[in-house]
Amino acid sequence: SLDNAIAFFTEIGLILEGRMMVEGERAGRVTGLGNQSVEIAMMVTPDGHSRLELSHFFAPQTIADHRNNPVNSLGYLRVMFRVDNLDELLIRLEKFDAKVVDEVVQFGETYRLCYIRGVEGLLIGLAEQLGSETASDILEKK
């Protein structure tokens, strides 16, 4: 449910900015779905720089379900967030039946990373930065 997804992403650290119903042909011209009925919730990251739109379509009916596809599937099926305490967050996300896809892996002294299956089967990457070196710093060295 959309309420469950909002609660899940709130637990990760995002903030609900607002939610609303979007219906009709005009909105459907944006998505290419025609006469649609969808409830959206806009979540914002704690720094205010990024937003994540969650949606629940009532019409038209869903025609494909990719929730259990692996991380290398074609399409936009995953998102990653930097978090402060990965182990603590994983415990808090258990109430949403979130499961680590394989394991938490540490990359040097820089990051601890994992993918989880969250609400509605969403594939979410979680990254805990361990030191002051950022992903950009690492990429610049290469």
State where each predicted segment sits.
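Localized edge beta-strand/strand-to-loop motifs within extracellular or lumenal beta-rich domains
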Residues: S1, D84-N85
